[in-house]
């Protein structure tokens, strides 16, 4: 008999709302988060997962909302905009060794009014603004003269629109240790607007977790493979990238 649960996550505030009835062992794993840097948010990025499986035939549904303020300013480029992410998905523990996941993620440009909050945070802790206070607030602006890129006023447009699937095989699992290997397929297609385009990517990752008392340690090493060497307005991007992550609960 399949058992279902819903796992909402609001990543913008690092706030997790679990159902307490499933708090035993490692049913939740690490807080789910997706990289929000300009290049990573529009491509496949491996993220931290539990090395343990769910109980057989469990189905876990999840959803998240993330808001981000992008600011990067050098002599070569300037990025100043907001992006927002909505994500839904579900995992199914098909058997004791196999898990399958389906995920949809939408990233779009919209005014989330973070500029003022960010400047206040920098002032509070004595962090320099790096020019943020010299330009208008709430802009949507990307300039990279080296690559003939100049985009302004793209508020309301889709930045990424992707569907991905993930299959995981349980290599080892006992009371303390969990080791699993997973592979991902990722397809992104933006039909129109400034960020129009499509890309197909693949990923593989090794997940290891260790339980000790009420705590858990999580780690991940992964690789992403791309047929295209461009991302985000056709900017150069590596065909293959590696990622490592660790966490404690």
PLM regions and their residue ranges:
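Bacterial N-terminal signal peptides that target proteins for export
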Residues: 2-10
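Bacterial N-terminal signal peptides
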Residues: 10-18
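Transmembrane beta-barrel domains of Gram-negative outer membranes and organellar outer membranes
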Residues: 23-194, 199-219, 223-226, 242, ...
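A beta-strand-loop signature enriched in Asp, Gly, Thr, and Trp
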Residues: 232-246
């Amino acid at each position: 008999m399949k058992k279902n649960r819903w796992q909402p996550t609001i990543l913008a505030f690092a706030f997790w709302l679990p159902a307490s009835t499933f708090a035993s062992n490692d049913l939740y794993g690490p807080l789910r988060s997706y990289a929000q840097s300009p290049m990573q948010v529009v491509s496949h990025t491996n993220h931290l997962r539990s090395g343990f499986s769910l109980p057989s035939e469990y189905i876990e549904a999840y959803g998240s909302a993330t808001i981000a303020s992008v600011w990067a300013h050098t002599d070569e480029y300037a990025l100043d905009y907001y992006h927002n992410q909505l994500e839904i998905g579900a995992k199914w523990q098909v058997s004791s060794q196999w898990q399958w996941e389906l995920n949809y993620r939408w990233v779009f440009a919209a005014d989330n009014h973070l500029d003022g909050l960010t400047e206040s945070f920098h002032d509070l802790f004595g962090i320099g603004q790096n020019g943020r206070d010299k330009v208008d607030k709430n802009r949507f602006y990307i300039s990279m003269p080296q690559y003939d890129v100049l985009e302004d006023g793209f508020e309301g447009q889709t930045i990424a629109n992707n569907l991905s699937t993930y299959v995981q095989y349980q290599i080892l699992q006992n009371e303390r240790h969990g080791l699993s290997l997973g592979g991902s397929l990722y397809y992104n297609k933006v039909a129109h607007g400034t960020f129009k385009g499509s890309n197909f990517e693949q990923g593989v990752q090794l997940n290891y977790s260790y339980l000790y008392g009420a705590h858990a340690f999580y780690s991940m090493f992964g690789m992403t493979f791309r047929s295209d060497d461009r991302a985000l307005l056709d900017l150069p991007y590596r065909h293959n990238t590696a990622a490592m992550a660790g966490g404690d609960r």
